[in-house]
């Protein structure tokens, strides 16, 4: 079985008290528009998503293109789903240095139960692997923490958060009939390279130099 782990596109920010479930930003919507073509070569048989809006909205263009429903599995939600706000990870460094230090060290935010997060994500994947045909390709629209956890479990990295997982990126996992997992690719972003925040800054700087 092949699993395509797609991180959600760029969301809006939510402030304290607004919850951690924002919609996609305009930039994020532009990123999602490129996913149907980027995934066109894969014979996707099911589309699964986290219950969070940013993941569902990222999944919808692919589901529409394939004429498949978006199946929701709560267990693919991000570790932040019960937090009071959503701050894009690239903004945490300046606004909350203590939590940023935890992330750099490979830990989840202090308010998150890492063991519970790990247990629910691994259970979701185990159930998925057990429920589909070995020849199936399933697209799972989820989050950077979920994708990092799965890579950590498969590759045995020292830290849970070890990988750069960009918005609308694709990470490809292969599962044998016995459930053995292999990593085929990580953080494929060619389809949205020019739409990622850090790359847009590089492009802007380059344009300024040429101007």
Which sequence ranges carry the predicted segments?
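Active-site-proximal alpha-helix that buttresses catalytic centers in soluble enzyme cores
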Residues: 2-72
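Generic beta-sheet signal
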Residues: 3, 136-142
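Short active-site segment of divalent metal-dependent hydrolases/proteases
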Residues: 11, 146-147
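Generic structural signal for well-ordered alpha-helical scaffold segments
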Residues: 33-40, 118, 122-130, 151
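Short beta-strand scaffold positions
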Residues: 49-50, 119, 141-142
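Active-site signature of alpha/beta-hydrolase-fold catalytic machinery across serine-
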Residues: 61, 149, 153
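Phosphate-handling substructures
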Residues: 65-123, 211
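Acidic, low-complexity terminal tails and accessory targeting/binding regions
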Residues: 71-72, 78-90, 130, 134-136, ...
């Amino acid at each position: 079985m092949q699993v395509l782990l797609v991180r959600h596109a760029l969301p809006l920010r939510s402030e304290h008290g607004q919850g951690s479930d924002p919609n996609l930003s305009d930039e994020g919507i532009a990123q999602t528009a490129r996913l149907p073509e980027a995934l066109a070569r894969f014979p996707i048989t099911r589309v699964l998503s986290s219950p969070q809006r940013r993941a569902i909205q990222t999944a919808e263009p692919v589901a529409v293109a394939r004429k498949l429903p978006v199946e929701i599995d709560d267990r693919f939600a991000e570790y932040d789903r019960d937090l009071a706000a959503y701050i894009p990870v690239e903004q945490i460094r300046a606004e909350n240095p203590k939590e940023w230090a935890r992330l750099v060290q490979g830990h989840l935010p202090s308010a998150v139960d890492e063991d519970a997060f790990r247990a629910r994500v691994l259970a979701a994947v185990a159930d998925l692997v057990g429920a589909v045909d070995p020849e199936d390709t399933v697209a799972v629209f989820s989050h950077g923490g979920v994708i990092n956890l799965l890579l950590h479990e498969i590759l045995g990295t020292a830290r849970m958060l070890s990988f750069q997982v960009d918005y609308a990126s694709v990470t490809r996992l292969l599962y044998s009939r016995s459930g053995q997992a292999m990593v085929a690719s990580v953080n494929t972003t060619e389809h949205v390279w020019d739409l990622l925040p850090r790359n847009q800054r590089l492009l802007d700087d380059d344009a300024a130099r040429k101007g």
